[in-house]
Amino acid sequence: GLGKTFISIQKDELRQAMIDLINHLVVMNLYKVPPERILLLTPHCLQENTCIHKVTHDVYNCKQCGRCQVGGLLKIAKEYGCQFIVVTGGTLARMKVKEAKPKAIIAIACERDLASGMADVFPIPVIGVLNERPNGPCCNTTVDINKVRDAVELLIDKDNYERNC
């Protein structure tokens, strides 16, 4: 009923406030991270669900065809020299973070997954970028590529890297 809708809206607003606060604190700290120690972490729902080139085991399987935004994110990762991992869920995300040992993370997800994930990896600095869900949750989601690029630009140690254009 109405009460349930109100509570879920409040929860997402609360999560959004937490994400905004953590993003703000990360930005205020002026981190300078070598690009290879920045992890771009995204959910597999960003990939077009009919695509046969699965990117969850190897993001370089992406053919950058333009049907979804995985290709655009891969371009950013290659351009700056960041790590880029696509995961199927929170448990795998936490495991991949442990393996990758990043000094900073740019995470793309919905409010719920971002809020819990940002808390789970503390004290690693995370910039959270909300995905957009035009087809509902967990299916063919999108993200503002410019927000992701801006996050990389904020975290990267500009004095010590060559851009791979």
Where are these regions (language model features)?
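Proline-aspartate-enriched helix->loop->beta-strand connector
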Residues: 101-103
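Short, well-ordered alpha-helical microsegments
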Residues: 70, 93-95, 113-116
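A short, gly/pro- and small-residue-rich
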Residues: 60-62, 117-134
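Short amphipathic alpha-helical segments
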Residues: 53-54, 98, 117-120
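Electropositive, gly/pro-rich neighborhoods at or near active sites that engage anionic ligands
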Residues: 1-38
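Short His-Asn-centered micro-motif
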Residues: 41-43, 85-90, 106-110
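Ser/Thr/Gly-rich flexible loops in soluble cytosolic domains mediating phosphotransfer, phosphorylation
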Residues: 127-165
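Redox- and metal-dependent alpha/beta enzyme cores, enriched for Fe-S-associated oxidoreductases
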Residues: 30-80
